[in-house]
Design a protein with these regions (language model features):
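Transmembrane alpha-helical segments of polytopic membrane transport and secretion proteins
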Residues: 1-40, 116, 274-292
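Alpha-helical transmembrane segments of bacterial inner-membrane membrane proteins
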Residues: 17-22, 26, 59, 64-76
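Membrane-water interface segments at the C-terminal ends of transmembrane alpha-helices
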Residues: 32-63, 75-181, 206, 210, ...
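Short hydrophobic, aromatic-rich alpha-helical segments embedded in or entering the lipid bilayer
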Residues: 64-75, 237-250
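Short glycine/proline-centered loop/turn elements that form peptide/ligand docking sites
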Residues: 184-188
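The alpha-helix within a helix-turn-helix
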Residues: 192
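Glycine/proline-centered hinge or cleavage motifs at structural transition points of membrane proteins
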Residues: 195-196, 209
Length: 292
């Protein structure tokens, strides 16, 4: 630890001696807080990295061909089919969830702030309601007249997306609400309306660009949940979704599930990076303009 020598300042009137002496305390070198932050970072890194490393070592235990599990997984058409199906369902879920959550959170914050606790309580309901209860309720209600959806593939897909939208409410609403809290939504709205913009234009051209980071955060969480979800997809997916496929593979194969987990982990992160890149690439200055 390095120290800085103390300095002494003499204060007085010329010819009358020194009136006061001020001594500055020695300053410490490296901050203890910075060292503690690095320790926490290293512990967190090992906490997330070591399980991945252990999974990788387990996946290459196939002898003599250590990458046999990866070749078998990549050669299975059900792997890419299930992953693509879950990814598409996840993207649709994100779009529908944003279309519901963003206007709701914006209107509550702008017009009816007293309803905010009620909306927060409603968005937390998926944490209380188990997915198996939700899926059996959907099947029971929509398997009989007047609205039969479980009898067709399209109807089952619609129910699946609706269930995932409900599951995404806690994560998406928290992300959007945090983004709205970071901007002055009222001033932006008044400025846009003073230039002749309607509510739809304000939300699409003013609010959305200013909470882009929050929207991407909620989208990432939603996509990760949809791709790995098992219970609802097992009952409603018209084809083998990725979650049920991974569960079925784990019952019959010892090493392939580890390979699937690592491959899907990498592909999911690649998809998230692409989405983030698209969001940053399309970033533009907010234009507050009325109709001409």
């Amino acid at each position: 630890m390095t120290t800085v020598p103390s300095t002494t300042t003499k204060v007085g009137i010329p010819g009358e001696g020194v009136a006061a002496v001020a001594t500055t305390a020695p300053r410490r070198g490296p901050s203890i807080g910075k060292a503690f932050a690095w320790i926490v970072f290293v512990i967190a890194f090992l906490y997330f990295f070591l399980p991945l490393l252990g999974t990788f070592f387990h996946s290459i235990k196939t002898r003599p061909d250590i990458f046999l599990a990866y070749r078998q997984v990549l050669g299975d058409p059900k792997f890419f089919g299930g992953l693509l199906y879950s990814f598409v369902v996840g993207v649709i879920t994100i779009i529908v969830s944003l279309a519901i959550i963003v206007p709701t959170a914006y209107w509550v914050r702008l017009k009816v702030p007293r309803m905010r606790p009620v909306v927060e309580f409603v968005t937390l309901m998926p944490f209380v309601l188990p997915p198996v209860v939700m899926v059996f309720g959907l099947i029971r209600v929509y398997s009989s007249k007047p609205l039969v959806l479980t009898g067709t593939n399209f109807g089952s897909d619609v129910l699946l997306v609706c269930a995932y939208v409900i599951l995404s409410f806690p994560y998406m609403y928290r992300a959007v609400d945090t983004g709205l809290a970071a901007i002055d939504a009222r001033t932006l709205t008044e400025a846009a309306q003073s230039l002749g913009s309607g509510w739809a234009r304000v939300i699409l051209r003013v609010i959305f660009p200013n909470i882009r980071t929050a929207l991407l955060s909620g989208a990432f969480l939603t996509l990760a949940i949809v791709i790995g979800e098992y219970t609802i997809a097992n009952f409603l997916a018209r084809t083998a979704a990725f979650g049920p496929y991974l569960s079925l593979l784990g019952r019959n194969q010892p090493y392939q599930p580890a390979a699937v987990s690592l491959i899907s982990f990498g592909l999911t992160w690649i998809a998230m990076v692409i989405i983030a890149g698209i969001g940053r690439g399309t970033r533009s200055r907010v234009q507050v303009a009325g109709a001409r």
